[in-house]
Amino acid sequence: MLMMLKDILKTLAFSLIPAFIFAFLVILAMPLFQKNGIKKVFKIFFEDIKENKENLYLLFFLMYIFIVFYKTVLQRDFIYSPLENVFGGWKIFMTQYTGLDYQVIGNILMFIPFSLFFCLMKKTQSVKYLLLLSVLFSFLYSLLIELNQLIFSKGTFQLSDIVYNTLGGLIGALIYLAVKLIINKIKEKGAK
């Protein structure tokens, strides 16, 4: 568990600044730099983030997407046979002595924030629609990661990763909906 925590902290330390830069450039787009200059673009960017929560959520979402991609594809070493274990990785318990498989737990946990940020960005009242979109986008992003691992031989393509990542996305959406429900009930009590 300590090793997993160290690995997470190392990933965050090495990818946080590039993730911020990636998200910043995606939100503002390069033409703004050419038209207004860097100093003015930075000023506009931070003023917009202060005024608009949705853009702040988008910033965090894009940064998180980059961090996950960095960890799962870019940071990996070259693997000669990425299809070696396509159907592996389903066991939650490694053996009766070693306990939980941290890779399985990590795959689930990795996509909980993905769905939380995604849900924060969506302005929809339909619970079913939000759940469906969260699961769909978690599945698609996980598939994108696995295909990149396969194409660039950076990690092994595993169907279990897609399933566990999608499950994490579902859990993230359910957490968001539960917190939203609690907040709404508190607001209703306060209004009475």
Place the predicted regions along the sequence by residue.
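Bulky hydrophobic segments
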Residues: 1-153, 159, 173-192
